[in-house]
Each structure stands twice: as C-alpha cells, then as structure tokens.
Design a protein with these regions (language model features):
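N-terminal beta-strand motif that seeds the catalytic metal site of vicinal oxygen chelate
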Residues: 11-40, 90-93
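Core segments of cupin and vicinal oxygen chelate
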Residues: 30-73
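Vicinal oxygen chelate
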Residues: 33-37, 88, 92-136
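A short beta-turn/loop motif at secondary-structure boundaries
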Residues: 56-58, 84, 120-121
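Active-site beta-strand termini and strand-to-loop segments that position acidic
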Residues: 66-70, 129-132, 141-142
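Short, charged/polar surface micro-motifs in flexible loops or helix N-caps
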Residues: 69-74, 82-84, 100-102
Length: 142
C-alpha cells in the first residue's frame, strides 16, 4: 500500500510539498568584527541600523542582531571562532538603496569611508565602502 502512495505521489501534490519545504528567505547575514562595540556604533550611528538583540553569547562575544530599515534580512555582528581571518575583507553581499548619489553623500557626511564616488555600469550604479572593521561592501541602486 505504501508503494501505491509513493508511486502516485506526483504532479500537483509533490509540487505543493516542495513549495512548503523550500527555503524562503535569508534570515540574517553575519559580518565578522574584531571589536563588537566599535562595530555596533558604526552600524547604528553611521548606517542607521537598529538593535534587535544584544545579549551574551559566550565568554568572548555577544550576539548582536541588527535590523536594516525596510528589510527583512538582519545583520549579525559576530565572528565564529576560527573565522577571524575574514575580518577586513570584501564581503560577498551588497546593500541596495533607492538613490545611490544621495546615499553616498549622506553616509560620507556621517564619516563613512568610500573607495570611490558612485560609478555607473550597465547593471546599475554602485560604490564600495568600508565599515569600522575594514570590511568592504558594495552599495548600489538600479
């Protein structure tokens, strides 16, 4: 009898099951940091992120989870043990904004370090900035 169920489990039923178990979003991204206090100041004061959680994780670190305005994905300022070499490198993620020129000007005024002024490409306009830990990020608009 189980064989009949498995054999007949095709088409619409299978598609519905697959949709139910599929990954639906990125919950958070972890940004490696050397100094959590310095990084927290940067992300809240310069980028305008808000604190969701700031609690002890272990003897060395806290679990600091931040909200990006108008975004579901959260940012975690946390470095897994053994991943310290990632601090100060290019991050394989990018931030999106509505107006790159306005965002660039406002963040530069707040003291954010940029590698260059926004550059226009066929896929959009972008620039690179560094956080307090030397991590490099792309920020772009269409």
């Amino acid at each position: 009898m189980l064989q009949d169920v498995v054999v007949r489990w095709t088409g619409k039923e299978r598609a519905n099951y697959v949709r139910c178990i599929m990954i639906k979003q990125i919950k958070f991204v972890s940004i490696p940091v050397a100094d959590q206090n310095r990084a927290l100041d940067f992300y809240t004061e310069k980028l305008g992120f808000t604190i969701i959680t700031d609690q002890p994780f272990d003897e060395k670190q806290r679990w600091i989870e931040l909200r990006i305005p108008k975004a579901e994905t959260r940012v975690v300022l946390f470095t897994p043990e053994g991943d310290e070499k990632r601090i100060g490198t290019f991050m394989n993620m990018s931030y999106a904004c509505d107006d790159i020129d306005k965002t660039y000007a406002e963040l530069k005024e707040r003291g954010v370090e940029f590698e260059s002024a926004p550059q226009k490409e066929p896929w959009g306009t972008y620039t690179l900035f560094k956080d307090s830990e030397g991590n490099r990020f792309v920020v772009s608009s269409d």
